[in-house]
Swiss-Prot record:
One of its GO terms (biological process) is response to UV-B. This is Bi-functional coumaroyl CoA and feruloyl CoA ortho-hydroxylase Diox1. It comes from Ruta graveolens. One of its GO terms (molecular function) is 4-coumaroyl 2'-hydroxylase activity. The lineage of its organism: Eukaryota, Viridiplantae, Streptophyta, Embryophyta, Tracheophyta. Signal peptide: none annotated.
Length: 369
């Protein structure tokens, strides 16, 4: 067997094999950050996206933006209407005065940079092969073993179970900051549930049965998108919608997140311009199902950047794995027919994580034919 490439020089011809890339990026823990830091001049072939998936600036809807909502009067009729309208018509909105301390957000971003600044062998302790627990995972792309083209991204994914597990297994270099962020977001999460579910969907109350169905688990990801030698050939993240109830996204000032606009063409995208101190909320598949399609989980993607590194930190607010996803009875009370059949959240999640990003196809599993 021929020796695998160590990418120790800047010379690449774009024809590097999957084995070359997998050994350096995945097995040795360098990630795509390691490729970028080697100063490679040509994007290795495994990262080349099919022509139909590559992003073109021509697809961007100019002078358009997702709704920006001030949450300081979150329970006022005007703000409630703005949030529910955004969830119906955009599936994405950006919020300011959200109640999460700005100092906490800055510490989260700093901790993210610290983790990805670790030596490869230390980050590799959390890889699929080496991590002592499935709930903590460092990796690259999305599901590399089934992808025809890799995504230009490294990530650390941490599923919250308990304080004890977190203190034992989460990387110490970023653990406290992520826990602080999760705790600081709880009031915001409850307010969003009150607005979207109680006021928007007329669900009478979120009781001890419904709360786990809506917000019973949390996953936080640290994403790192290094600068790319040929950004036009690849993507940071391919087209997909989240499977969460909703996602709270913290991003830096670099930009790169694009959201599909719901319009007649179905092929226009809006760039989510970073706003200092803001958070981005996007509706997930779970809430689309529970609202019987009233709220929309929208396709989004991240484009690669040729000049700057980018980070983002999504906090996925998910149903409990044992929860059953189905439309709320209150939503169907006026005779509206259900669009979705009941499906276990664990089954839905398993389906999502066993295939490449493919737009909105995951939700088809729950649709009534």
């Amino acid at each position: 067997m021929a020796p695998t490439k160590d990418f120790s020089t800047t010379t690449t011809n774009g024809a590097e094999s999957w084995d070359d890339v997998a050994d350096f990026v995945t097995k040795k823990g360098h990630g795509v950050k390691g490729l970028s830091e080697r100063g490679i001049k040509t994007l290795p072939k495994p990262f080349h996206q099919p022509l139909e998936e590559r992003f073109s600036e021509k697809k961007i809807l100019e002078r358009a933006s997702i709704p920006l909502i001030d949450m300081s009067q979150w329970d006022s009729p005007e703000v409630v209407k703005s949030i529910c309208d955004a969830a119906e018509n955009w599936g994405f909105f950006q919020i300011v005065n959200h109640g999460v301390p700005l100092e906490t957000l800055e510490r989260v971003k700093e901790a993210t940079h610290r983790f990805f600044g670790l030596p490869a062998e230390e980050k590799n302790n959390y890889s699929k092969e080496n991590s002592p627990i499935n709930n903590v995972r460092f990796g690259s792309s999305f599901v590399p073993h089934v992808e025809k083209a890799l995504e230009w991204k490294d990530f650390l994914s941490m599923f919250y179970v308990s304080e004890e597990e977190t203190n034992t297994y989460w990387p110490p270099i970023c653990r406290d900051e992520m826990l602080e962020y999760m705790r600081s977001s709880e009031v915001l999460i409850q307010r969003l549930m009150e607005v979207l579910v109680v006021k928007g969907l007329k669900v009478k109350q979120i009781d001890e049965i419904r709360e786990p169905m809506l917000v019973g688990s949390r996953r936080i990801n640290l994403n790192y998108y290094p600068k790319c030698p040929n950004p036009e050939l690849t993507l940071g993240v391919g087209r997909h919608s989240d499977i969460s109830t909703f996602t709270i996204l913290l991003q830096d000032q670099i930009g790169g997140l694009h959201v599909r606009k719901l319009d007649d063409t179905g092929n226009t995208w809006v760039h989510v311009t970073p706003i200092a101190g803001s958070l981005i909320i996007n509706i997930g598949d779970a809430l689309q199902i529970m609202s019987n399609g009233r709220y929309k989980s929208i396709e989004h993607m991240v484009v690669a950047n040729g000049t700057q590194d980018r980070i983002s930190v999504p906090l996925f607010v998910n149903p409990k794995p044992q929860a059953i996803l189905c439309p709320f009875p209150e939503v169907l009370a006026n005779g509206e027919k259900p669009v979705y059949k009941p499906v276990f959240c664990s089954d839905y999640s398993r389906h999502f994580y066993t295939k490449p990003h493919d737009g909105k196809k995951t939700v088809d599993v729950a649709m009534i034919n």
